[in-house]
Amino acid sequence: IRGFGIKDVNDLVCWNKYLLETYGKDHKILMYGKEQGANTILNASGRHVLKNVEAIISDGAYTSPYDIIGYRLEADYKISKYPAISIIARHIKKAVRIDLKENTTKYVRHNDIPTLYFHAKDDDFVPLKMVYPLYNKNRGEKVLFVLKDEKYLYELVENDDFKQTLSQFIKKYMK
């Protein structure tokens, strides 16, 4: 996927339509996305183009491509994001017609699909601080769970808080 979660919305809508045409329009869908995939789902949810989607699980979403690329420039290459991000943004806009400043918070303001946001406290790709504007601007029902670390997700035990949160969320919205 090379649409930064923006152009990918059209692909997601096609998959959504395909699922309903193939398996029947009475099916309920839970969508899960990680990082860019989460942004794709969140961007689509605010446009009201998803059908039969009862719930969303967003894992490590970012506020905008502009923000995450700027962050990665500083974290990975130790260079100031300015003016590099401006040059990159202009090039991408010209080459593939994507505005990197397209902000997912603009779409979640209109999201009415229940959404579980989770993010690892020590996420080394998308910083934790990016989940808060998304969660705070989300109009619909929402839950936020901050994982103590990424590995924690794969070591779930029976009495685990996240496992319980996830289970309760799915049971509530996927009846």
Labelled PLM ranges:
Residues 43-97:
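Hydrolase active-site cap/lid region
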Residues 150-163:
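Catalytic histidine-centered segment of alpha/beta-hydrolase-like enzymes
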Residues 122-126, 152-153:
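Acidic catalytic loop of the alpha/beta-hydrolase fold
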Residues 23-35:
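Alpha/beta-hydrolase fold nucleophile elbow
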Residues 110-112, 117-119, 123:
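Short beta-strand/loop motif that positions the catalytic acidic residue
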Residues 113, 127-136:
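Short alpha-helix in the alpha/beta-hydrolase fold that links the catalytic acid
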Residues 33-43:
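Glycine-rich nucleophile elbow surrounding the catalytic serine of serine-hydrolase chemistry
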Residues 2-23:
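Alpha/beta-hydrolase active-site loop
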